[in-house]
Structure formats: C-alpha cells, structure tokens
C-alpha cells in the first residue's frame, strides 16, 4: 500500500445521523452526493486506493461511493477494513446482507 495514493474513510453510525436509518431523507441523499464528489476529487488528486471502515452508516456510504468510482475510473482499488471477524454478527439481516455484499465487492479486506 502506497500512503501517497491511499485515502481512508470512517464516519458516524446511523444512530448519530439526524436521519438515522432513513437513507431517502434529502439530507442523506445530499451527503451521499457530496461523498461521491469528494471521492472523485480525491481521485483527481492522485488517490487510487480507498480504505473503508465497514460499520453501518457513513462507512457504508463511503464504501459505496468508492466502489462506484472504481466502475468509472481506471486503477481504483477498494479495501474493506474490518475491526473483527464478528463485526456484523448482531446486526439486522438487511445490514448484514449489505455488509457481506460490500465486502465481497471490495478488492481486498484487512482484519484488524
């Protein structure tokens, strides 16, 4: 991993966000659009490897933005940074399914 071209993400869980679980809320949609713009700007500045925390909420949004960037731009890799093997074990089924889908789509995963 080259630190000069690596960008890391982590953020708030849904409980700390004003819209909580409602990803259709205009504020959430605005945040996701801004994240997509920030990821694109990072790419323009030379970032190619994106490390994503894999918690619910903003971590998921960032991972999804990085994966979308990878579809549009060459040379992008996305790595899931997982704090422990059982991270998603106690989550609701839909959150676990989203987590597994994101991890599967990432190029690499690192267990801390």
Outline where the language-model segments fall:
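Acidic/glycine-enriched connector segments
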Residues: 1-112
């Amino acid at each position: 991993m080259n630190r000069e071209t690596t960008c890391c993400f982590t953020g708030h869980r849904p409980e700390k966000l004003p819209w909580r679980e409602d990803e259709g809320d205009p504020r959430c949609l605005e945040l996701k659009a801004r994240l997509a713009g920030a990821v694109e700007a990072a790419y323009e500045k030379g970032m190619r490897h994106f490390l994503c925390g894999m918690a619910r909420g903003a971590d998921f949004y960032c991972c999804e933005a990085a994966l979308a960037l990878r579809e549009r731009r060459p040379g992008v890799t996305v790595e899931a940074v997982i704090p422990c093997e059982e991270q998603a074990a106690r989550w609701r089924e839909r959150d676990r399914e989203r987590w597994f889908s994101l991890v599967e789509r990432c190029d690499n995963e690192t267990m801390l």
